[in-house]
UniProtKB/Swiss-Prot annotation:
GO terms for molecular function: lipoyl(octanoyl) transferase activity. Catalyzes the transfer of endogenously produced octanoic acid from octanoyl-acyl-carrier-protein onto the lipoyl domains of lipoate-dependent enzymes. Lipoyl-ACP can also act as a substrate although octanoyl-ACP is likely to be the physiological substrate. Residues 31-207 form the BPL/LPL catalytic domain. It comes from Azotobacter vinelandii (strain DJ / ATCC BAA-1303). Belongs to the LipB family. One of its GO terms (biological process) is protein modification process. Substrate binds at residues 70-77, 137-139, 150-152. The active site is at residue 168. This is Octanoyltransferase. One of its GO terms (cellular component) is cytoplasm.
Length: 218
């Protein structure tokens, strides 16, 4: 492990400017551009993937819906959910997309194990599950060998908006969160710190280096 991944902790950020910044970063990066991980939360929003079907949006109500360029179907983001955007040069790493997804899932499973939560991945539905309930969602886009979008881990949030959709296109999919599964207290900042460490280790980086500056500098 020799590479360094830069980490931006962006706080609560509207979805649209974050998505636009991901597109800019991915479009402008060169062969030597270091990889980055963005950790943040979003105000309430539904995002619909490229293959998203309208029938999976049951009754969005007053929550905005954004059509985006990631894989997968509709999902929900809201405060108390930890979102991680993985801006990686997948081609440079020599990692296949399936391997990338597996390593992200392993990062989440190991993080949850640290809270005595037994979680697993499913071959038929990307993401991480506790029993039959989904606790983390994945959705990536690869463009010219570079990834963007990423993961969303339910930490301590209002899960009710998930009832307005078929999460990730699965009718009746039950959602859960770390707060409801962990045996002890859950601090959002600590979960964020553990996630960055797990992702760096599982993806083969020697160091996760904090970057200053928000997306307006990108």
């Amino acid at each position: 492990m020799t590479a360094v991944i830069g980490v931006r902790e962006l706080g609560l950020l509207d979805y649209l400017p974050a998505w636009q910044a991901m597109q800019r970063f991915t479009g402008q990066r060169g062969a030597q551009t270091p990889d980055e991980l963005w950790l943040l939360e979003h105000p309430p929003v539904f995002t619909q993937g490229q293959a998203g079907k309208a029938e999976h949006l049951l009754f969005p109500g007053d929550i905005p819906v954004v059509q985006v360029d990631r894989g997968g179907q509709v999902t929900y983001h809201g405060p108390g959910q930890l979102v991680g955007y993985l801006l990686l040069d997948v081609r440079r790493s020599g990692m296949g997309v399936r391997e990338l997804v597996s390593r992200i899932e392993r990062s989440l499973i190991e993080l949850l194990a640290g809270y005595d939560v037994e979680a697993h991945a499913r071959p038929d539905a990307p993401g991480v599950y506790v029993g039959e309930m989904k606790i983390a969602s994945l959705g990536l886009r690869i463009r010219n060998g570079r990834s963007f979008h990423g993961l969303a881990l339910n930490v301590d949030m209002d899960l009710a908006p998930f009832q307005r959709i078929n999460p990730c296109g699965y009718a009746g999919m039950l959602m859960t969160q770390l707060k409801d599964q962990a045996r002890g207290p859950v601090e959002f900042a600590e979960v964020r710190s553990r996630l960055r460490a797990q992702l760096a280790a599982q993806l083969g980086y020697a160091e996760a280096k904090t970057l200053t500056g928000g997306i307006e500098s990108i």
